[in-house]
Amino acid sequence: MDELVIAGRSFSSRLMVGTGKFASNSLMADALAASGSQIVTVALRRVDIDRPEDDLLAHIDRDKYLLLPNTSGARDAEEAVRLARLARAAGCEPWVKLEVTPDPYYLLPDPIETLKAAEILVKEGFVVLPYINADPVLAKHLQEAGTATVMPLGAPIGTNKGVRTRDNIAIIIEQAIVPVVVDAGLGAPSHVAEAMEMGADAVLVNTALAVTPDPAGMAHAFRLGVEAGRRAFLAGLPAQQQKAEASSPLTGFLRDEQ
């Protein structure tokens, strides 16, 4: 399968994985391995980046995975920027998944504060991957600001509802000049396959892997879903049509039709 390229860096996997909600860190580590992922997101508020022996970080091989700190929990641009700076000061690579979610109930991203934070972080040399509503206009503004990707939500975080924002994501993909990563709400392998079939460059999944009784098994299923969807997109899906069209001749063997 072709490689994903973000900010000049190549990845063989198009499945990114989050580390929250797992029943144990060993289950999380097994899921990461089964997923084939190379990019792993970690909420900065959940770990002590300064301490590699932190139990969560001890289960993530930093030579194998790109550790992508995220600013989950930030309510405005100021908090998000502060979290990103703390991660870089602690020795993390200057990559950040930018999340600004002032509403703790629906966890929908704040477009104004997200754009504001992105502009600051890009100027400071960060590789910024912003989590956003599926808003094509905002996506264009973020790309113009210099973000490395845009990450529109399929559905609200943790809802497992799938690609509910399909029409807007299709517009974002059509207009994108950076990779489009569908993030949030993807609860089944069929959901990630759908996103990849649409032409998304990658997907990010967490809850669907963490809450299942078999995280590693589900991670492997999602891996296959991503690969199937990407291969289908590259091969070229047939156009949909209203009228039926037979795949084999209907005449000439039972009767002749004029």
Curated annotation (Swiss-Prot):
GO molecular function: thiazole synthase activity
Reaction(s) the record says it catalyses: [ThiS sulfur-carrier protein]-C-terminal-Gly-aminoethanethioate + 2-iminoacetate + 1-deoxy-D-xylulose 5-phosphate = [ThiS sulfur-carrier protein]-C-terminal Gly-Gly + 2-[(2R,5Z)-2-carboxy-4-methylthiazol-5(2H)-ylidene]ethyl phosphate + 2 H2O + H(+)
Subcellular location, record wording: Cytoplasm
GO cellular component terms attached to this protein's record: cytoplasm
EC number(s) from the headed UniProt entry: 2.8.1.10
SUPFAM superfamilies registered for this protein in UniProt: ThiG-like
Gene3D superfamilies given in the database record: Aldolase class I (3.20.20.70)
Active-site residue numbers: 97
Matches recorded under CDD domains: ThiG (cd04728)
Primary enzyme class: transferase
GO biological process: thiamine diphosphate biosynthetic process
Origin: domain of life: Bacteria
Pfam families reported in the protein's UniProt record: ThiG
Family: Belongs to the ThiG family.
Subunit structure: Homotetramer. Forms heterodimers with either ThiH or ThiS.
Name assigned to this protein: Thiazole synthase 2
Native source species: Syntrophotalea carbinolica (strain DSM 2380 / NBRC 103641 / GraBd1) (Pelobacter carbinolicus)
